[in-house]
Amino acid sequence: MLKLKKEDYEKILDHCRKGLPNESCGLLGGTIEDDVKTIEKVYLLTNIDESNEHFSMDPKEQLSAIKDIRQNGYQMIGNFHSHPESPSRPSEEDKRLAFDPNIEYLILSLMDAENPVLKAFGVDKEKNVTVHAVSYTHLRAHETGRNL
């Protein structure tokens, strides 16, 4: 199972909407305990391809995010990207470029602007795709300084 704070979902959604008409992308750092992956920090990266059909993360931003993940004692949970004009499922290119069977691949479809769809996937070494459950959580009051 993958846990994502609603606030982080909103952050990803906002980043992807601002990136339209192109795909947007980023990395996800967090913790892994048993079979539960908890996203603790979302890293919004630049799609240097500036394309609505594929993405390449800015290498400098990617390196900076990986350094921050390590400095915070997090693990690489996965990455995300948007599909501005297609469903929330891995394309053939997404599967081909999925290099690590241990991380999550999140895809946010903006095909229906009023009803975005975020799904998490695993891609094994044979390029078989598995849909993973996403649990949305709220920040605890002490994390925001306010009552929820």
Give the role of each language-model region.
Residues 26, 33-51:
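Short, surface-exposed acidic-centric catalytic microdomains
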Residues 2, 51-55:
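Short, surface-exposed loop/turn motifs that are enriched in glycine and acidic residues
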Residues 56-134:
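Active-site-proximal loop/helix of nucleotide/amide-processing enzymes and allied scaffolds
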Residues 24-29, 66-70:
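Short, well-structured hydrophobic secondary-structure segments
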Residues 1-22:
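Long, hydrophobic N-terminal alpha-helical segment
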Residues 137-144:
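Conserved small/polar residues in nucleotide/adenosyl-binding loops
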Residues 23, 38, 73-75:
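Short loop/turn motifs at secondary-structure junctions
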